[in-house]
Amino acid sequence: MPTKRQLCKHEDDGWADLNGLVESLGPEQMEEPGYYPDWSVKDLVAHLAAWMAEAARILTQVHYGTYLKRDLDVDAMNKDFYEANHDLPLPVVRAEAFAARNRMLAEMNAIDEVIPEAEDWFEESGPRHYQEHLPRLREWVQELQGRG
């Protein structure tokens, strides 16, 4: 099992790639639909933030020994996250993403022993999740910048 330092380094590398692409866009580009048909880059950032916040919540439970595994309806959660965040202003979405990431990292750091569930939540909500979305984000950023 990787150490916390290795897990956080993996997350930091993925975040740097993702955030670099996001920051290469102007505010109007971040809000233009097309990342997915109805999603903008802002919606993607909100989506990632929601899952990082969920991971932070779970990691807190792991830290205090109150974590109970439960089945998730990921599609329903994604829909709820989208509906809750879609109309938020871009600066709020970006601030929430940075806050959620910081909390996720802090909660991971607070855990005495990284158990498999903690590793899974951290990886799935952080670096693996970034990797899942990076290919399409790279394409969409190229398309947006090519219009300029």
Predicted regions and their residues:
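Alpha-helical bundle segments that constitute or directly flank the non-heme di-iron/ferroxidase center
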Residues: 1-27, 50-60
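Residues at secondary-structure transition points
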Residues: 2, 35-39, 88
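Hydrophobic packing residues in well-ordered alpha-helices of helical domains and bundles
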Residues: 4-11, 90-97, 123-126, 130
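Short acidic/polar alpha-helix capping motifs at helix-coil junctions
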Residues: 6-8, 21-23, 46, 68-70, ...
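Short, contiguous alpha-helical
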Residues: 12, 31-76, 109-148
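Acidic/histidine-rich alpha-helical segments that form the ligand environment
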Residues: 77-117
